[in-house]
């Protein structure tokens, strides 16, 4: 009887140790399973090329809503100050963007631009500007031009004769670009008209 009494506690401790080890393994397995499941559910982000997209051709001229005259589009790309964009989704997009070395606001390695309502885009939407020389400028919509400031097709800002305004940080913008108000001065290859705007069905979140 004394021997049996001595063996009982040892057996009980052994069982407790085994149960603890099994529980620990179960927790580890459960954790791994949950992590893997989340990874599968989230999945890798699909390439931009796989998103639906709409292409808009840009004409070489437009009619001024003020004078009624036909104005040629020479390819100008003006600038807009980011600090003045503080409203709604556009304000949020500008608040999380940062200027590059020339003072151009960028987000996700894309330039913030303001465009007219013709393109049916919203702040944060991905788009490409295709230039006449084949250069592609990767952009994200950072602001919407007011219809009152654009032509009847809501493509061009009739006062500046441009279809794309690059959003800049006026504290760090390159001096020559700021003084002339011409974003095309950033790169020699940008000095060409925009002939097409491609809007992707993807919005920065």
Roles of regions detected by a PLM:
Residues 1-4:
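Sec-dependent N-terminal signal peptides of Gram-positive bacterial secreted proteins and lipoproteins
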């Amino acid at each position: 009887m004394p021997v049996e009494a001595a063996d009982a506690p040892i057996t009980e401790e052994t069982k407790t140790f085994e149960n603890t080890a099994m529980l620990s393994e179960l927790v580890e397995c459960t954790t791994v399973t949950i992590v893997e499941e989340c990874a599968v559910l989230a999945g890798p982000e699909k390439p931009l090329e796989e998103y639906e997209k709409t292409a808009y051709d840009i004409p070489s001229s437009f009619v001024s809503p003020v004078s009624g005259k036909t104005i040629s589009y020479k390819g100008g790309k003006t600038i807009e100050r980011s600090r003045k964009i503080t409203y709604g989704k556009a304000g949020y997009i500008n608040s999380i963007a940062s200027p590059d070395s020339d003072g151009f606001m960028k987000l996700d390695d894309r330039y913030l631009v303001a465009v007219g309502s013709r393109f049916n885009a919203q702040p944060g939407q991905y788009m490409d500007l295709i230039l006449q020389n084949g250069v592609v400028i990767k952009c994200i919509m950072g602001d919407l031009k007011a219809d009152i400031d654009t032509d009847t097709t809501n493509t061009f800002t009739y006062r500046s004769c441009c279809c794309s305004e690059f959003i800049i940080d006026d504290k760090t913008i390159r001096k020559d670009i700021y003084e002339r108000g011409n974003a095309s001065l950033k790169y020699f290859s940008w000095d060409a008209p925009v002939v097409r705007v491609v809007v992707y069905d993807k919005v920065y979140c």
